[in-house]
């Protein structure tokens, strides 16, 4: 093999680039130098250690890359050293591509140089990526020489993709370049449908390489939206639970934010990135930041995680954190469900404001006076929600259950906290023996969901639970003895239940349920009237009797001004307090946490004296929003102002202001005129009802008693009423 002379050009082939340069002489030598060998001398002397000749193929063309030698060696015809492998796996030094650009001009005489060998066409292609500030230099990431399927060589410079380049959509660079290359190669022979498929593939790949940060943010937003909103029951329970947690001794390190300067822990902000405490959670809860109960639970878990991360679990603060976490998890089991069916009071049936067809003004008889429809009426009453009486009963049941769930009874009450798990307890035949299981947790859930219709239903479930215990566990076993102990506690608590007055309940029910479904109608006629089974008559009659009694008292013996004022204040006045604001309730609840033992005892005495149902209880827990105004202001002035007498002074001042607003009392003449107007109104109702024959038996009896005769005309109503009044 002999060197080949090419006129006017000096072509040198390195492991990474072929360069050309014009020369002044008549001929030039095509030479190469091997990586790792000394560079060729500049004085024109050739060294065998630095050069090896470029051979010719059988057809006389140049073999720049040693393909013919490689083929001969594979066939066993040539035993010389193979130099082509040094090109396929280059080693430093390399040529730097940073000074070049794809748009830089090339020499006109070598712009389209091709070398043919072995009847195959070899193309030399220079390819480089865009310069990037984040890419490494060419010495650490050199260009690579790759042989393609069409036997062409490609020099490419690669650089790793840094994590920062994944932001702002930079991750699509490699994918887009590859898709554009495939698309350009396929555009020559592919159909339009194939090109459309390539476009869709590229679009899909760009979506797959979307920013991971954006996907994380979207996932967090979706998780945040999927939590159910906090219900009223959950809000009340979490408020009480948070107050109870802050009241315990183990919560002392967690009541306020950590002060690194004051506590001399400068590394705390470095270790704990998201600090949280009970005081901050109380503020967030009061301002309505927690839209879901899960958000509150997440903050509580974050507080415990921060504690264990910085203090460990064996330090004093870590032990207090574990105790507080155990209390929180135990209370969290009783959290009401987020999916609670709301019980709403059925509204009134809309009254008809138009006359019936045919102009006939008829009125349905009240169902309460009809024996035939009594069953329907009772059914309609059964559909109504329970009134205040039932609420008081359920509150007592809740207090009994709360007492049984206290920690002091845990030693013998824990088997009844949750439903029996036959697998965990090792009693697979439990449900074969016990057909209707019951436990305290199920009863608590039923109370929270208003599933008990009365106290008897609650008591029946409690008796059922103990009955199941004695049925499955024979006498003398530990669980049987625990059930006996817990049942004795329940019997003592149940024996102290208040005596709910049935007559009071019936009176409240009748007041709240009368005319609930609107049995009367208003007719569109010249003489409109509203008739609700005589209630208007009774109201007018009560006003008449009230004014008559006042008038009779004025005509009686004269009393002194001081005595009369005192009697009027006793009979007509009540202590009126200003409205209780939400800020006052929060202030009272906060200040109660910092009272001493003596102050708490005095507050308990105030509550027991004002609320009889708390007199026999050892521990008092009352909702601030449910306290009567007089009791609230007594406790509020004592706890927040330090002056218990201020509440009475406030009530007196409010009453005096109210009396001034009422104005002067009516004189005898004015009261007589008021009585006359009320009687005229009563006579008008009575006359219309008699003329239309639509008055029920009770109203007719009332007219007979008050007017004397049902046959009197409307013109004589005034005289008949006067005669009946004089009689």
Swiss-Prot record:
PROSITE patterns: BROMODOMAIN_1, BROMODOMAIN_2, NET. Residues 27-231, 341-369, 699-727 are annotated as: Disordered. SUPFAM superfamilies: Bromodomain. Keywords: Bromodomain, Nucleus, Phosphoprotein, Repeat. It holds the Pfam family Bromodomain. Belongs to the BET family. GO terms for biological process: chromatin remodeling; DNA repair-dependent chromatin remodeling; heterochromatin boundary formation. Residues 102-114, 153-177 have a biased composition (Polar residues). CDD domains: Bromo_BDF1_2_I (cd05500), Bromo_Brdt_II_like (cd05498). Residues 570-650 form the NET domain. The keyword Signal does not apply. It is found in: Nucleus. Residues 229-335, 388-497 form the Bromo domain. Residues 69-78, 128-150, 206-231 have a biased composition (Basic and acidic residues). It comes from the Eukaryota. The modification Phosphoserine is found at residue 162. This is Bromodomain-containing protein C631.02. GO terms for cellular component: chromatin; nucleus. One of its GO terms (molecular function) is histone binding. It comes from Schizosaccharomyces pombe (strain 972 / ATCC 24843). Gene3D superfamilies: 1.20.1270.220, Bromodomain-like.
């Amino acid at each position: 093999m002999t060197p080949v002379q090419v006129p006017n050009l000096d072509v040198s082939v390195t492991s990474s680039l072929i360069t050309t340069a014009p020369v002044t002489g008549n001929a030039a030598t095509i030479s190469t130098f091997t990586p790792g060998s000394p560079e060729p001398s500049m004085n024109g002397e050739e060294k065998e250690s630095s050069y090896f000749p470029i051979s010719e193929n059988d057809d006389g063309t140049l073999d720049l890359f040693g393909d013919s030698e490689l083929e001969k060696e594979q066939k066993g015809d040539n035993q010389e050293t193979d130099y082509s492998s040094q090109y396929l796996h280059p080693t430093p030094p390399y040529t730097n591509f940073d000074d070049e650009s794809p748009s830089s001009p090339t020499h006109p005489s070598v712009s389209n140089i091709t070398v043919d060998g072995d009847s195959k066409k070899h193309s030399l292609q220079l390819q480089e990526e865009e310069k990037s500030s984040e890419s490494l230099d060419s010495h650490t990431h050199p260009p690579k020489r790759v042989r393609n399927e069409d036997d062409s060589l490609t020099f490419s410079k690669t650089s790793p993709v840094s994590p920062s380049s994944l932001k702002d959509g930079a991750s699509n660079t490699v994918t887009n370049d590859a898709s554009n290359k495939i698309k350009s190669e396929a555009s020559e022979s592919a159909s339009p449908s194939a090109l459309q498929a390539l476009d869709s593939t590229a679009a899909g790949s760009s979506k797959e390489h979307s920013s991971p940060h954006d996907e994380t943010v979207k996932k967090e937003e979706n998780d945040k939206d999927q939590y159910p909103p906090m219900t009223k029951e959950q809000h009340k329970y979490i408020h009480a639970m948070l107050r109870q947690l802050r009241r315990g001794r183990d919560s002392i390190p967690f009541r306020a934010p950590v002060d690194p300067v004051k506590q001399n822990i400068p590394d705390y902000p470095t270790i704990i990135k998201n600090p949280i405490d009970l005081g901050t959670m109380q503020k967030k809860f009061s301002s309505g930041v927690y839209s879901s109960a899960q958000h509150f639970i997440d903050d509580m878990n974050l507080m415990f995680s921060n504690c264990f991360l910085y203090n460990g679990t064996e330090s004093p603060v870590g032990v207090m954190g574990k105790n507080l976490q155990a209390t929180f998890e135990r209370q969290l089991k009783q959290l009401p469900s987020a999916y609670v069916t709301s019980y709403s009071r059925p509204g009134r049936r809309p009254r008809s404001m138009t006359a019936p067809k045919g102009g006939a003004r008829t009125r349905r008889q009240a169902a309460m006076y009809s024996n035939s429809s009594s069953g329907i009426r009772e059914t309609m009453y059964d559909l109504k929600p329970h009134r205040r009486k039932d609420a008081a009963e359920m509150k007592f049941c809740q207090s009994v259950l709360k007492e049984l769930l206290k920690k002091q009874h845990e030693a013998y009450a824990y088997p009844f906290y949750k439903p029996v798990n036959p697998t965990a307890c090792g009693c697979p035949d439990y449900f074969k023996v016990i057909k209707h299981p019951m436990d305290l947790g199920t009863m608590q859930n039923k109370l929270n969901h208003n599933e008990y219709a009365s106290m008897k239903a609650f008591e029946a479930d409690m008796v059922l639970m103990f009955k199941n215990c004695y049925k499955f566990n024979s006498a003398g076993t530990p669980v049987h003895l625990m059930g006996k102990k817990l049942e004795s506690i329940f019997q003592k608590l149940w024996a102290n239940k208040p005596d709910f007055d049935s007559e009071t309940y019936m009176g409240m029910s009748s007041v709240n349920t009368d005319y609930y479904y609107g049995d009367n109608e208003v007719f569109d006629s010249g003489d409109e009237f509203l008739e609700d089974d005589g209630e208007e008559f009774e109201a007018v009659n009560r006003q008449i009797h009230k004014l008559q009694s006042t008038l009779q008292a004025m005509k009686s013996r004269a009393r002194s001004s001081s005595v009369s004022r005192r009697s009027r204040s006793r009979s007509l006045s009540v202590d009126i307090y200003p409205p209780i604001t939400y800020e006052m309730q929060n202030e009272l609840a906060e200040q109660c946490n910092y009272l001493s033992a003596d102050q708490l005892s005095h507050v308990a005495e105030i509550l027991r004296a004002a609320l009889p149902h708390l007199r026999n209880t050892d521990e008092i827990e009352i909702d601030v929003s449910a306290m009567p105004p007089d009791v609230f202001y007594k406790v509020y002035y004592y706890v927040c102002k330090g002056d218990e007498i201020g509440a009475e002074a406030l009530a007196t001042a409010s009453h005096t202001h109210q009396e001034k607003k009422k104005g002067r009392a009516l004189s005898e003449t004015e009261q007589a005129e008021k009585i006359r107007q009320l009687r005229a109104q009563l006579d008008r109702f009575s006359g219309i009802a008699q003329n239309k024959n639509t008055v029920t038996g009770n109203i007719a009896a009332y007219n007979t008693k008050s007017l004397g005769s049902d046959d009197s005309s409307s013109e004589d109503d005034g005289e008949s009423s006067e005669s009946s009044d004089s009689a």
